[in-house]
Amino acid sequence: MTNNLKPGERLDDLQIKGYEIIQSPGRFCFGMDAVLLSAFAKVKAGECVLDLGTGTGILPILLAAKTKGKHFTGLEIQEESADMACRSVRHNRLEEQIDIVTGDIKEASQIFGKGSMDVITTNPPYMIGGHGMANPESAKAIARHEVLCTLEDIIRESARILKAGGRFYMVHRPFRLAEILTAMCEAKLEPKRMRLVYPYVDKEPDRKSVV
């Protein structure tokens, strides 16, 4: 597989089922938030899962390894990241379980159809667009800042795509909790469970998961 890596890419061991993922340090590599979200999300046998803003496909791969879900789809707007995700899926021989789609989150309900998914996961950009960006068009800026989509876009499209009784899982930062709850209320998604994550016992929580 290393012969198929493009310049600047590396193959990282995911420490589960022998799966590996292609990443590029020059772009945006997954962090602990994606791992935490994969542990927080509950996927039942036979369910279909959509990951919005999948990046290099870390969440579909981890959820395929950890759960008995029927099928996993990752939506990613950046073509280079989507290409790495596709190659990681092939490398792990997960083509029958995982699809990677290149597309815009703002058009997700048009791409997949309303009421089509049992579960939606997302590890979205945390920062409001325009704050502290050296280059707003860089891959890292797009992953970290709301350049191409907003929190409201993600929640609105998720509400449209979920089946009745479906579940929405998101990891985000505590400082935007009020916005998250407001957007979920407007989209008629009712928060049921929240987990605060403390980096150290004597520190404030720096991220949270919401369903």
Language-model-detected regions and their locations in the chain:
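Conserved Class I SAM-dependent methyltransferase catalytic core
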Residues: 148-205
